[in-house]
UniProtKB/Swiss-Prot annotation:
Signal peptide: 1-26
Documented EC number(s): 1.1.1.-
Keyword tags: Cell wall, Disulfide bond, FAD, Flavoprotein, Glycoprotein, Nucleotide-binding, Oxidoreductase, Secreted, Signal
Cystine pairs: 41-104
Top EC group: oxidoreductase
PROSITE patterns membership: FAD_PCMH
UniProt cross-references to InterPro entries, sorted A to Z: BBE, FAD-bd_PCMH, FAD-bd_PCMH-like_sf, FAD-bd_PCMH_sub1, FAD-bd_PCMH_sub2, Oxid_FAD_bind_N
UniProt remark on cofactor binding: Binds 1 FAD per subunit in a bicovalent manner.
Name assigned to this protein: Berberine bridge enzyme-like 21
Subcellular location: Secreted, Cell wall
Pfam families associated with the record: BBE, FAD_binding_4
Glycosylation sites recorded in the entry for this protein: 79, 340
Protein's UniProt keywords contain Flavoprotein: yes
């Protein structure tokens, strides 16, 4: 496991000696010599003058190094003085740059961390306890929308906000099924499955892929045809960073109505919250597939009393009167009225889901703001529920949450299109579940003791939920990265270590992912603390 709080420079020095056998042990490589070797290699591969390369390759002595590093760190837990830092950051501006970064990192025997938007909850895209470089994809942000073909090519460094904005520029009746956080990077989001508030209608992001481009371990730039269907399948939900560097995806755009409806309804423990959450389990995953009913559950203090607030946040691909009539029959506990609803365009609903004030009036270009160098402290975990939690289970859950005080839950319903896709169509295996749970705790204080307290809250609630969630294995969602469920040191037991978390993320699809990994990257160059191992590492 990454030990960001205890990492010390002595260990980093030792890792340099061990990991770079081509340098004399009597004269360990300096950061300058590593940088010079990389720049020379990069120049040779890209046919670029070394003077031009300095704008895209940053050593630790570069005045811009710290700002480039911090820009896409989205979790303050991994932005401390003791957090391991890369020897070099590469910010490619072309596919050739990416290819060169791969081959040069490999030749220098440095681990390559691939960062798109920086939203990896455990920071695995930009930290390591081994000597490493960062490949920061943020400059590769092209989004080319073809409305006639109802498709778009999206570069890995683009954000979801940029994707939605570029679609909106071309059409008010097209969208793409992906997440609600506009600063999330496309590369990690889609390669890990990708979901949003249209998943019950259109499935996951990876259910809407046409093509992809990737740089493989040999620096080759491959599309779907040249990489083959096995590798294309693997990077369609199995996590791209285990197999290469995803350059981009060609996706199918989906039709959305001119007018959609959003609403938010909240209740507290003394006003029907338990009944609402209990009933939600039988409605959310089974209702009209045009309706997505997210459930937020949060401990709060109200009128000086600790309680729990349950909030339904919804998107309906249709008019307000339709959804009010529908839920009047299916979910009377919600007490939904038309005045609770707001009608708007699909793009405006994306702004609303991002908690923007007056989404029908705001400048759409706010989705082009990447909010750089801004990070709270946080921890996320995930679970899947296959059968409804009984009412007394909901009551006991609320009691436990009030005791803990901070940790919240998000229930995301499945059903609809999700239940129609076979379990092995993509690496994402959780199709038949009723809903997914996200455990979420966020704080602002930079304190080791405060962090320990909140991490403990997450672990206590996760343990409490054991009897209500999936078993053998206890499933998890790759894009809600959680190192508590297992990590890989990539030593002699790499396969066995990888199987622990791999089965939780991918179920039986883990076996095929291992085979693809072994064929595509037999020496395991592309690796992180939760990557897919090779079959060659099986004891």
């Amino acid at each position: 496991m990454i030990a960001t709080q205890t990492f010390v420079s002595v260990f980093f020095f030792v890792f340099f000696l061990v990991s770079l056998p081509f340098f004399s042990s009597a004269a360990p490589p300096s950061s300058d010599s590593i940088y010079e070797s990389f720049v020379q290699c990069f120049s040779d591969k890209t046919k670029s003058p070394q003077a031009q390369i300095t704008d895209n390759v940053f050593s630790r002595t570069n005045p811009s190094f710290s700002s480039v590093l911090r820009a896409y760190i989205r979790n303050g837990r991994f932005n401390t003085s003791s957090t391991p830092k890369p020897a070099i950051i590469v910010t490619p501006r072309s596919d050739i740059h990416v290819s060169a970064a791969v081959t040069c990192s490999k030749s220098l025997n440095f681990l390559l961390k691939i960062r798109s938007g920086g939203h990896d909850y455990e920071g695995l895209s930009y930290i390591s306890d081994k000597p490493f470089f960062i490949l920061d994809m943020s400059n590769l942000r092209d989004v080319s929308v073809d409305i006639a073909d109802q498709s778009a090519w999206i570069s890995a460094g683009a954000t979801l906000g940029e994707v939605y904005y570029r679609i909106w520029e071309k059409s008010k009746v097209h969208g793409f099924p992906a997440g609600v956080c506009p600063t999330v990077g496309v590369g990690g989001h889609i390669s890990g499955g990708g979901y949003g508030n249209m998943l019950r209608k259109f499935g996951l992001s990876v259910d809407n892929l046409i093509d992809a481009k990737i740089v493989d371990v040999n620096g080759q730039i491959l599309d779907r045809k040249s990489m083959g269907e096995d590798l294309f399948w693997a990077i369609s939900g199995g996590g791209g960073a285990s197999f290469g560097v995803v350059l981009g995806y060609k996706v199918k755009l989906v039709p959305v109505p001119e007018t959609v409806t959003v609403f938010r309804v909240e209740k507290y423990m003394d006003s029907g919250a338990v009944d609402m959450v209990h009933k939600w389990q039988s409605v959310g995953p089974k209702t009209d597939r045009n309706l997505f009913l997210r459930m937020l559950i949060q401990p709060v203090t109200r009128k000086k009393v600790k309680t729990v607030r349950a909030t339904v946040v919804a998107l309906f691909l249709g008019r307000a009167e339709e959804v009010v009539a529908l839920l009047g029959k299916e979910f009377p506990e919600l007490s939904l009225k038309k005045e609770n609803c707001s009608e708007m365009t699909w793009f405006q609903s994306a702004l609303w889901w991002d908690n923007r004030v007056n989404p029908t009036q705001i400048d759409p270009k706010v989705f082009l703001d990447r909010n750089l160098d801004r990070a709270n402290f946080g921890k996320r975990k995930s679970d899947y529920v296959a059968s409804e939690i009984p009412r007394d289970g909901i009551e006991s859950l609320f009691k436990k949450m009030t005791e803990l005080g901070k940790i919240g839950l998000v229930f995301n319903p499945y059903g609809g299109k999700m239940a129609e896709v076979t379990v092995n169509a993509t690496p994402f295996p959780h199709r038949s579940k009723l809903f997914k749970i996200q455990y979420s705790v966020t704080w602002q204080e930079n304190s080791v003791e405060i962090e320990k307290g909140f991490l403990n809250q997450a672990n206590v609630l996760y343990s409490f939920m054991t009897g209500f969630v999936s078993k053998n294995p206890r499933n998890a969602y790759l894009n809600y990265r959680d190192v508590d469920i297992g990590v890989n040191d990539h030593g002699t037991n790499s396969y066995e270590e990888g199987e622990v978390y791999g089965r939780k993320y991918f179920g039986d699809n883990f076996d095929r992912l291992v085979k693809v990994k072994t064929a595509a990257d037999p020496d395991n160059f592309f690796r992180n603390e939760q990557s897919i191992p090779t079959v060659l590492s099986k004891a």
